Regions:
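Short, internal acidic amphipathic alpha-helical interface segments
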Residues: 54-93, 97
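Short amphipathic alpha-helical segments
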Residues: 3-10, 66-70, 109, 113-116, ...
Length: 141
């Protein structure tokens, strides 16, 4: 069984190998900057527990309008997603969240996790803007 220290060390090795920027938040948590195209960056935290690592990535703040349409869109996407799911906090801000066993912290799985973060945060960004911020967008044009 992998412990939190070896899981964290494996993540750090992976991040260095892939030239991803990261910082230590505390002794159990690492924040990683995932580059994107539509959404320039997504910050993801990896919090290591005794048996699992929890991933949280901020996607976008709470929608200004059409909340129900945004949340419905997120829930419909959740059915098809790998390893992560959209969630909201008490402010209505949107995150990607996931929990993985420490034994899953392999290069192949980390590649899938980072690919999922990129696809689900960056790939969905414009759709979320169009659904939840249309008035603000039109006001800027």
């Amino acid at each position: 069984m992998t412990d939190r220290h070896s899981g964290r060390a494996h993540l750090e090795k992976f991040l260095h190998a892939h030239a991803l920027d990261f910082e230590e938040v505390n002794e159990t948590t690492i924040a990683v900057v995932v580059p994107g195209e539509k959404k320039l960056t997504t910050t993801a935290s990896f919090a290591f527990g005794d048996t699992t690592v929890t991933v949280n990535a901020f996607v976008i703040r709470h929608p200004d309008e059409n909340d129900l349409a945004v949340y419905r869109w997120l829930l419909e996407r959740n059915r098809r997603m790998y390893g992560l799911a959209y969630s909201i906090d008490h402010h209505g801000d949107i995150y990607l969240t996931g929990r993985f066993p420490l034994d899953a912290i392999t290069d192949a799985e980390l590649d899938r996790i980072f690919g999922a973060i990129s696809e689900y945060a960056d790939g969905a960004f414009n759709s979320l803007l169009e659904l939840g911020f249309v008035t603000a967008i039109l006001g800027e044009w």
